[in-house]
Curated annotation (Swiss-Prot):
Top-level enzyme category: hydrolase
Active site: S143 (charge relay system), D240 (charge relay system), H270 (charge relay system)
Superkingdom of this protein's organism: Eukaryota
Stated role: Acts as an acyl-protein thioesterase that hydrolyzes fatty acids from acylated residues in proteins. Regulates the mitochondrial S-depalmitoylation of the nucleophilic active site residue of peroxiredoxin-5/PRDX5, a key antioxidant protein, therefore modulating mitochondrial antioxidant ability. Also catalyzes the deglucuronidation of mycophenolic acid acyl-glucuronide, an active metabolite of the immunosuppressant drug mycophenolate.
InterPro entries the UniProt entry points to: AB_hydrolase_1, AB_hydrolase_fold, ABHD10_acyl-thioesterase
Protein name as catalogued: Palmitoyl-protein thioesterase ABHD10, mitochondrial
The enzyme's E.C. designation: 3.1.2.22, 3.1.1.93
Cell compartment(s), UniProt: Mitochondrion
GO MF annotation terms: hydrolase activity, hydrolyzing O-glycosyl compounds; mycophenolic acid acyl-glucuronide esterase activity; palmitoyl-(protein) hydrolase activity
Gene that this sequence comes from: Abhd10
Family to which the UniProt record says this protein belongs: Belongs to the AB hydrolase superfamily.
Length: 297
């Protein structure tokens, strides 16, 4: 049974799907850390993962203790976002390993964006896990990255020991597309492109190839149980106009792991990058590191 435990101080609520104490109480007890100011200002240097038959991937890595943290960005986002950098600073302050990277076709990575698909970006995540990361990892996925982290946990259960999703967009654009009127879907198919309005793009919209949507259909997860057995934390803003917060409840319901919490931010939007949002994210990571420290060598 899901149990709500609102915390007025920070304005979030935890919904526990497992037989363990909800996160909201422990989060409320944690004082804000001084990691914002005390962490070293030096950033990890830019490196490239060379792949023989795939585009080279740009990444930044901090070596340190396990479990390591890997930040998986959202759709068309690069590794330099506020959340990714904040998590890096926190990991640096604790001495934990951390990786952030750009998908192929994005940011500093090689590749042609027009040819990118969910399947290719899934391979990017697995490449980082297989060829860059060392030891057990906690994956932090934002939006599309939340969808891809689920795929990574399914494909590499021996290496992925926990997940944190931020506005997890499982089945993302596919669900939005199929919610359109049939006539609109036919128009998009004829044009070969979907012009999707968005205030998060300076042009006011995204141009999404029809082929991208059709390929993404092969990676949908919500139609059946999701075979992820590790601890999962799903953070979502209730003012998210891109991915409704109910999507995180759907994901939680589908995941087979008994250790799943959904944490809602009443004032949070899709990007979840305000100070209180970042604080919640950091506390959630800290909580999982504490939890896993008893089982991870």
């Amino acid at each position: 049974m899901a149990a709500w435990a609102p915390c007025r101080r920070w304005g979030w609520a935890a919904v526990s799907f497992g037989r363990h104490p909800g996160l909201s109480a422990s989060l409320a007890r944690k004082p804000p850390r001084a990691w914002w100011l005390s962490a070293c200002r030096q950033k990890a240097s830019l490196s490239f993962l060379n792949r023989s038959e795939l585009p080279n991937l740009a990444y930044k890595r901090l070596k340190g203790k396990t479990p390591g943290i890997i930040f998986i960005p959202g759709y068309l986002s690069n590794m330099n976002g506020i959340k990714a950098v904040a998590v890096e600073e926190f990991c640096k302050s604790l001495g934990h390993a951390f990786i952030r990277f750009d998908y192929s076709g994005i940011g500093s990575s090689d590749g042609n964006l027009a040819e990118c698909t969910v399947g290719k970006w899934r391979k990017d995540v697995l490449s980082i896990l297989d060829d860059v990361a060392e030891g057990p990892q906690i994956l932090v996925g934002s939006s599309l990255g939340g969808w891809l982290m689920l795929h990574a946990a399914i494909a590499r259960p021996e290496k992925v020991i926990a997940l944190i999703g931020i506005a997890t967009a499982a089945d993302g654009l596919v669900t939005q597309y199929h919610a359109l009127p049939v006539e609109t879907q036919k128009e998009i198919e004829m044009k070969g492109e979907w012009t999707l309005p968005s205030r998060y793009n300076k042009e006011g919209y995204f141009r999404i190839p029809y082929s991208f949507i059709k390929e993404a259909e092969h990676h949908c997860l919500l139609h059946s149980p999701i075979p992820v057995t590790c601890p999962v934390r799903l953070l979502h803003g209730m003012k998210d106009e891109i991915v409704p917060w109910q999507r995180s409840l759907q994901v939680a319901d589908r995941i087979v792991s008994p250790d799943v919490d959904v944490i809602l931010r009443k004032q949070g939007d899709h990007r979840m990058k305000e100070k209180a949002d970042i604080h919640l994210l950091i506390c959630t990571i800290d909580d999982l590191i504490d939890k896993l420290s008893t089982v991870v060598p």
